[in-house]
Amino acid sequence: MDDSLWSACLQQLEREIPEQQLNTWIRPLQAHLEGDALRLYAPNRFVLDWVRDNFSARIGELLAEIRPDEHLRVELEIGSPPTPDQREAATGATRAAPAQRSSEPRQRPVDSNLNPGFTFDSFVEGKSNQLARAASMQVADNPGGAYNPLFLYGGVGLGKTHLMHAVGNAIRTARPEARVLYLHSERFVAEMVKALQHNAINEFKRHYRNLDALLIDDIQFFAGKERSQEEFFHTFNALLESEQQVIMTCDRYPKEVNGLEERLKSRFGWGLTVAIEPPELETRVAILKSKAIRDGVDLPDEVAFFVAKRLRSNVRELEGALRRITANAQFTGRAIDVDFAKEALRDLLALQDKLVTIDNIQKTVAAYYKIRVGDLLSKRRSRSITRPRHMAMVLAKELTSHSLPEIGDAFGGRDHSTVLHACRNIKSLIEDDARLAEDYDNLLRTLST
């Protein structure tokens, strides 16, 4: 394998492709140079098809730029490079010919711990979670298939656990006898410790390795727990070799979890790794409206938009705000409108305003773009300054309750029309500029959490 060639391609792709797309589609690829072909090995059909449709042409162009005299071509395959030192190749035969399930009698049905309210029908889809939902539905239709394991990562309250339960509920609906278990990684550790204390580790192993689907939440909790990681490693391998589904969630990309063994991180990449981002405005509104309908609450559109614009971090925060508005309306007998919502959420909104100030936004944006706050306030008009300045103005409008004139004044005494132009300019550019869209999402996430 020619590491330098693929590394050179990756370095360029890192400058062109948003981080989330790199983690999902490019970094799972393994490369092997064979003759005049750079073979890229994808972990599954889903990744292969996406790379072929969206990135293979660009990768081919990069090969021509890096080694113009060799006339290299790109070939895509599913699997691992045929290199002796690749551990995945050593297990290839095992994965191709699944181990036989134990001949022992099946244990009695397990308590799945599934929440029946978490289904695909009750999950509100948006751009931020579209891929995660699609992958989860594929797993529900074909558990143990190509997307095994399925690894969902993202911040708190974004729907990872909901999707995991939705898969489990769908599997149980199709196969009521299926042994599906959902649990938090903390419980896995606690049960393992208890089994060790009572000399019942073999029973513990049989329990987990006889499942049809294991859904385990917040695997970052395993960090630093070597004995727990060892047991989960063997459980994970046993389930995958038997073509039983594993789904995991984490609050960050698996390779970013410190204290997690490299062999676990490597195996997590065998299937499909998908990020869930904070919901965009339209999705936040849809979440509020959907929740209101399920609860029998008449929520006016203008109230839904008001709440969605002010609260941006996650779904739980939105649902908590709706519960507070609903409870206040029931207790007071008043109709729900924007003024009532402001009153019901006044302490929450005050906290939000206190946490996110124009000064804080300016410092965050300046640090992100590696410029000085003074540059944002100056009269300089170079693109390296105006773009961050416009971004900061948009975020000030989005994240604070300040008026346009107040925002303009905070940016070196500019008028409201300048702020309005900046907002329209950034919103327009985001539609076509993936890198700018990623900047916006990163800054919004940083300031909203």
From Swiss-Prot:
PROSITE patterns for the chain: DNAA
Record localization: Cytoplasm
Coiled-coil boundaries: none
Disulfide cross-links: none
Region Domain II: start-end pairs: 83-112
The UniProt record lists the keyword Nucleotide-binding: yes
Keyword ATP-binding listed: yes
Protein family: Belongs to the DnaA family.
Name of the protein described by the UniProt record: Chromosomal replication initiator protein DnaA
Organism this protein belongs to: Halorhodospira halophila (strain DSM 244 / SL1) (Ectothiorhodospira halophila (strain DSM 244 / SL1))
Gene: dnaA
